[in-house]
Amino acid sequence: MPGCPCPGIGMAGQRLLFLAALALELLGGAGGSQQALRSRGVAAACRLDSKESESWGALLSGERLETWICSLLGSLMVGLSGVFPLLVIPLEMGTTLRSEAGARRLKQLLSFALGGLLGNVFLHLLPEAWAYTNSASSGGERQSLQQQQQLGLWVIAGFLTFLVLEKLFFDSKGKEETSQAPSKDPAAAAALNGGHYLAQPAAEPGPSAVVRNIKVSGYLNLLANTIDNFTHGLAVAASFLVSKKIGLLTTMAILLHEIPHEVGDFAILLRAGFDRWSAAKLQLSTALGGLLGACFAICAQSPKGVGTGVGVVAVRRGALAEGHGRPDPGIRARLCSGPPRGMGGGRYTWPPSPPQPVRAPPPATEETVAWILPFTSGGFLYIALVNVLPDLLEEDDPWRSLQQVLLLCAGIVVMVLFSVFVE
């Protein structure tokens, strides 16, 4: 017809219009879906931020703030035990080490320190690591054996680490010159060299050589003490997370254990060349390790919903009844009955209905406890057997050798008594 468009052109136009409409629809849908995805992502981020703020708010809540204060104060008290040797060792000890009486007294203190180090390793650190491995093992005897072998490897790793550190800062020539340097008092020189007088005086080494080589073992001992105090901070904080009573008992137990150990460490620092006040100040500086351990233990519990995690160190310090796997009556309520009254409900009943087991420790704390105890044991073994024992073996006088052996046994007996009656 004359007024109608061509049928072919009409079909092509309709197809173009249809395709254009379809493209616009797809573009609009894609834009809408992208906007929806963007809005969902913003909402998820907001939820994560709110959860993060809630977790950190719980970390700094009133009840947890009290745990923070008690844990940090307890760790600080353990660190302040480093000043106890100032009350035991006479004031003139630091200035009379080059006299005959001072050198002999230092060897007596070193004998006690050697016994304390060996007792600390074999009666305290390694048994705790062994007990933790057995309690954490759930894969049968084969897995338990592998974990115990890993403990041995960590002990060797700690020993070798301290060996490498001393090699890095050790000058054998300087030490040889230092060991043969003449003393102003010949009797003191004889006491320090196993009762033998030096036949010929050697050249006096420079002050830098003496300072650099004498103090290597002292710095290694400070490093080992810092790591050991880190584990003490873990124990104190984890115990306060259980209850204030358990936290106080744990703090007192660690304090009683640390006092004889600090006396031995003080003697090692004096042997390394530190004066009395410098040794005391450096002993106090190791308290920073305890504070870091306490902060690590508390922060590992709350943020991002990690869990309770108090079983790691609190169990090692006697928070659970020995041999039964059941919480002590004093802490049963907190472990299994939920929040206290006024904090969300929950009654203190035992056993709960249904029973609620204690949740597994957080991975970070678990991995830390798994290696830090045997690693510290290896470091203490290196200090005892490489830095302290050779000085005692140089003694030739039978009576003084007997005194040193008796003092060594006394150091071990003290650790045995604290392990039996305190922990």
UniProtKB/Swiss-Prot annotation:
Highest taxon of source: Eukaryota
InterPro entries assigned: ZIP
GO cellular component: cytoplasmic vesicle membrane; endoplasmic reticulum membrane; Golgi membrane; perinuclear region of cytoplasm
Stretches in topological domain Cytoplasmic: 37-68, 130-149, 257-278, 390-401
Residue intervals on the Lumenal side: 1-15, 90-108, 171-235, 300-368, 423
Catalytic activity, reaction form: Zn(2+)(in) = Zn(2+)(out)
Record has Secreted as a keyword: no
TM annotation in the entry: 16-36, 69-89, 109-129, 150-170, 236-256, 279-299, 369-389, 402-422
UniProt entry keywords in alphabetical sequence: Cytoplasmic vesicle, Endoplasmic reticulum, Golgi apparatus, Ion transport, Membrane, Transmembrane, Transmembrane helix, Transport, Zinc, Zinc transport
Motif (XEXPHE-motif): 257-262
Record note on quaternary structure: Homodimer.
Family label: Belongs to the ZIP transporter (TC 2.A.5) family.
The protein's name: Zinc transporter ZIP13
Source organism: Bos taurus
